[in-house]
């Protein structure tokens, strides 16, 4: 039976329409990342393309990396800990084609070093997938003095993108234009970007900080589309879905118990491979060739929150704010001491 909270929200998924309407928990009929690859004829069919993924060694990162590797292209898997990365990704690593890149997006020095290392190995980058993240953690500052959720979910990725921007632009071709994909979250509903106090000094609350950072991820890709879409570089953001991963490690146990006990959550939840499907749709879906400035969920563009629905689905009105997006871009450049 279709879930009434989401049935009015679901659009056309083609062969998966019924699967998304009749959700039945992890491993149900909803597509995996590899299913999306097959549907788009991307299996072993992109040998001339280069991909870079952050947050590769845990959660949906492993499955996203597995799918990118299955394209036959060159894949750089960003990991904070090389030893952990070797263990987690052993099945897909392939010397000279699928390799690790030491990268901690919570450290701007690490981001700069990783970008320099990448550029010493490749003059090409077709898709950048910013997947690394943390959620609802206690207040903390990074080594650079930034609020940790902002730095890890957004600011480190913005810096990485800026350092690779010209490579993304020069790698774009008429048959496959370059893409930047930011993994956001339904958590963006929790807050717009607090532009006048982006580090939330004196007003920190874990979920507000998460919303602040995840909306920033959406704004970033919207602004990429505004600035560079006409030049063959596109930005897309997405909600992967409800997936049980270490991302939830800071969430109060009682809250987790409450989430897990609801029938909606049990049926809405996805496996990591299913969660990575929307990321791969954004990164490689043919329907998004030459397009961007959108927020996806369940492998399609998200609509507004349905009447009577939950914050688990749909996109908040504040996710699209051209004036705010420009201000955030300029503020981010200033925070990182970058010029345009």
Curated annotation (Swiss-Prot):
Which terms are listed as keywords in the entry? NADP, Oxidoreductase
Question: Which residues does the entry assign to the active site, renumbered to this chain?
Answer: 184 (proton donor), 210 (proton acceptor), 214 (lowers pka of active site tyr)
**Which InterPro entries has this protein been placed in?**
NAD(P)-bd_dom_sf, SDR_fam
**According to the record, what happens upon gene knockout?**
Reduces the production of PR-toxin and leads to a large increase in mycophenolic acid production.
In which residues is NADP(+) bound?
A: 60, 84, 104, 131, 162, 210, 214
> What is its EC class?
oxidoreductase
The text of the family note is:
Belongs to the short-chain dehydrogenases/reductases (SDR) family.
Q: What is this protein called?
A: Short-chain dehydrogenase/reductase prx1
